[in-house]
Amino acid sequence: SVFITTNLLSQSKLALIVAVGEYPATSKIKPIASVNDVKYIKTALGRNGFEQKNIDTLINSKATKKAIINSLTQLSEKAKKNDIVVIHFSCHGQQIRDQKTIELGKDEDDGYDEAFLPYDAMPKYSPTGYKGENHLRDDDLYPHLLNIRKKLGSEGSLLVLLDACHSGTGTRDESFAVTRGEPIPFANPENPMDSIINLSAAEAKQGFFEAAADSLSNMVVI
């Protein structure tokens, strides 16, 4: 009884919310309702005992790749045994040519990494400019998530919500819906690859459309 009480008192509930719905005009990335997701997620977290001071939010221009990585690092440093951690990403998703990493090597059968588009990412490859350095790859996330998971131990919990996808069969009328994701993979056109896989709240081959005012997936989650 004493052990259980002590265990619960020492448990913290930590969260990181990343939402990018408005990108720089120069990127020509379509706006989406990601920022509206934040209020739903924060409300749900509050109902489950998360204190506002323990919920870190990165919205639009604040959600650069560097800022996201820094927040993940800080979250990893704060997390301890038995804690509960929730990480939510709501933004555009896109595939990008697989790159070899020390941890994973070449890990994608189709030759593409799944990636999120932070605020400072661009959707198209340029041989003289942007080459994908600000895309947030699954390989970028993996070491942070693995480290957090290890620190939480067997009694802790890590929940990761990934709300991004590519175009496909819509679940709503396209006249008032927009896709959450870039349908064209990010790659050097001199070495194209044709496979497309969703990084999404949907199945790998499902399209995901959101109503103009709010995200669909988080309304289901809540």
What are these regions (language model features)?
Residues 9-14, 215:
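A short, charged/proline- and glycine-enriched loop
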Residues 10-12, 67-90, 95-177:
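Caspase-like (clan CD) cysteine peptidase catalytic core
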Residues 12-29:
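Short glycine-rich His-centered loop
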Residues 19, 38-42, 59, 123, ...:
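Active-site-proximal C-terminal subdomain of hydrolase catalytic domains
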Residues 24-39, 43:
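Glycine- and acidic-residue-enriched helix-capping/strand-helix junction motifs
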Residues 39-54:
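Signal peptide-proximal N-terminal region
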Residues 55-65:
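Short beta->alpha junction loops
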